[in-house]
């Protein structure tokens, strides 16, 4: 299984590659073939077939989950264009920044752009080879107060001497 961060790093390394060299589906294939945890022999059909790959009749069965719409996008998911039209025409990799890395014919190659419905993105999927980052970009915030006691360390949310401990570590 490829970690989302690794997949995104690999895709970002391909930004600027011409569309003639690497179209959108081949960008996804290249990421899966070259990342640690990937499969050097991985293949899939076109973008429309990838979108349909969650069905039992699908040849490749690459998606483990999909939805119409882009709400709830997480780093490592695939974004799609054309969902609901019968012709899913484009795909890219969702990043931790809420952007999508994709190979755009109109822009001439691999780019990173906003992931918005206005831009045409209207579907999400989870690929069986790429682990979605559940807490992408999550950074603990706030202050914790450490109290040294004879029985070990105790962590509080507030500096007062009363109240519940968040965590206690014995010596």
Where are the regions a protein language model picked out?
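Short, solvent-exposed loop/turn positions at domain surfaces
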Residues: 66-67, 160-166
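Active-site nucleophilic cysteine motif
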Residues: 19-36
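Residue-level recognition of short, solvent-exposed, well-ordered loop/turn junctions
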Residues: 71-74, 164-170
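Solvent-exposed, acidic/flexible segments
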Residues: 1-4, 20-25, 85, 168
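...with weaker cross-activation on analogous glycine-rich loops/strands in unrelated enzymes
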Residues: 2-5, 38-124, 131
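SH3-family beta-barrel domains
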Residues: 133-157, 168-170
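Solvent-exposed, polar/charged alpha-helical surfaces in well-ordered, non-transmembrane soluble domains
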Residues: 5, 9, 13, 26-30, ...
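Active-site nucleophile-His-acid catalytic modules used for acyl/amide transfer and hydrolysis
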Residues: 4-22, 39-40
